[in-house]
Curated annotation (Swiss-Prot):
Protein name stated in the entry: Alpha-ketoglutarate-dependent dioxygenase cnsP
Organism: Penicillium expansum (Blue mold rot fungus)
Listed cofactors: Fe(2+)
Region of interest (Disordered), residue spans: 1-20
Keywords: Dioxygenase, Iron, Metal-binding, Oxidoreductase
UniProt similarity note: Belongs to the TfdA dioxygenase family.
Length: 370
């Protein structure tokens, strides 16, 4: 089958079949409402980043170009083939993803190594999540969550009808042990550009708050649930949501990453619904501020553009992200996500005499007085 390469501004290459057929038919979305998804249950998670050499010799030994997409989040790496990394290299990948939030790898053969090899590589970071209603490949594994938007399947568009398609979130935060290091492989991107992923640093979202407000948030927990998402899918006739049903978990508002020990704001507007112990109106007020803080502070976010062979690796414990449906209806955006689950979120707590609080508070007081 013949293909054509589409060149868009910014030298992004996007291959397309001349007859309009998908480039990767084996990854077409398959929905089966009769399948039941079993809960993995509690498990002990050891983050591979603990074993990593902080100098990253195994990860970056073949790198030809490495640069930061923004000061606080995002690094693009050329010359490294993810499929060729050994265990030590994957450990270092986990560490760098935790430190930088999101990593972009170009010219990858990851798509071509097959379902089983993909799962084996990504399961290095934890047991793989199976989505409660999103599709998977008909001939592949349930762990592969298919990302698909095209004129022959407008379910993504229907799900976001009447709402902004830019919705900052952390995938599957209603799980008792939510995702950590996660992979997206883009198979086919819109011909007109667009379809990027936005990523925001939750570490910087936390640290950029005033010290007294940070202190107030620490020790709080919030309810995360997918109830709204399940209801929305049922509204559009998506019976596959009943494969798993409604999930709910209580997580700290501020967590600590198990490897880097950095504190991160762990709330998102898609799944976080209420701060425990607060009246609903009080909770809504605080959460609205935090959601706006995440969405509006572009000084700690980056934008991931896709091209053929791009793989995005990011740590969901220290980031929020969003899709962008900014391309014409009918243009194809096709990819898949593999999502390892990680540790139960670790709550952050600063004591009254914490040096970090005292130092930062003094800095803010000086700034306010000037």
């Amino acid at each position: 089958m013949s293909t054509t390469t589409v060149i868009t501004p910014g030298t992004i290459t996007r291959e397309k079949n001349e007859n309009g057929a998908p480039l990767y038919p084996d990854y077409m979305p398959f929905y089966d409402p009769l399948e039941k998804v079993e809960d993995i249950g509690a498990f002990e998670h050891f983050d591979p980043g603990h074993r990593a050499d902080p100098k990253l010799p195994n990860l970056l030994k073949n790198a030809t170009k490495v640069w930061e997409l923004s000061p606080h989040v995002g690094t693009e790496i050329h010359g490294v083939q993810l499929s060729q990394l050994d265990s030590a290299g994957l450990d270092e990948l986990a560490l760098l993803a935790a430190q930088r939030g999101a990593l972009v790898f170009r010219d990858q053969d990851f798509v071509n190594i097959g379902f089983d090899a993909q799962k084996k590589l990504v399961s290095h970071f934890g047991p793989l999540h199976i989505h409660g209603w999103a599709p998977h490949p008909a001939a592949g594994s349930e762990e592969h969550m298919i990302i698909y938007d095209h004129k022959d399947d407008l379910r993504v568009r229907q799900s976001w009808a009447g709402r902004s398609p830019v919705q900052w979130h952390t995938d599957q935060s209603p799980e008792q042990q939510p995702p950590g290091t996660t992979f997206i492989a883009m198979l086919e991107s819109p011909t007109t550009a667009g379809g990027d992923t936005l990523v925001s640093s939750s570490v910087r979202a936390y640290s950029s708050l005033s010290p007294r407000f940070r202190k107030r948030l620490e020790g709080l927990t919030a309810i995360h649930t997918n109830n709204d998402g399940v209801s929305q899918e049922l509204k559009h006739g998506q019976q596959a949501v009943m494969r798993r049903g409604v999930l709910q978990a209580e997580h700290p508002v501020v967590l600590v990453h198990p490897v880097t020990k950095q504190k991160a704001l762990y709330v998102n507007p898609v799944y976080t619904k209420k701060i425990v112990g607060f009246d609903q109106e009080e909770s809504d007020c605080i959460l609205k501020f935090l959601f706006d803080h995440i969405a509006k502070r572009q000084d700690f976010s980056c934008r991931i553009r896709y091209e053929a062979g791009t793989v995005l690796v990011w740590d969901q414990r220290v980031t929020n992200h969003s899709q962008t449906l900014d391309y014409p209806i009918g243009d194809r955006r096709h990819g898949f996500r593999l999502t390892p689950l990680a540790n139960k979120p670790i709550p952050a707590k600063i004591e009254e005499d914490d040096e970090e609080f005292s130092t930062d508070d003094a800095r803010h007081l000086v700034g306010n007085a000037s």
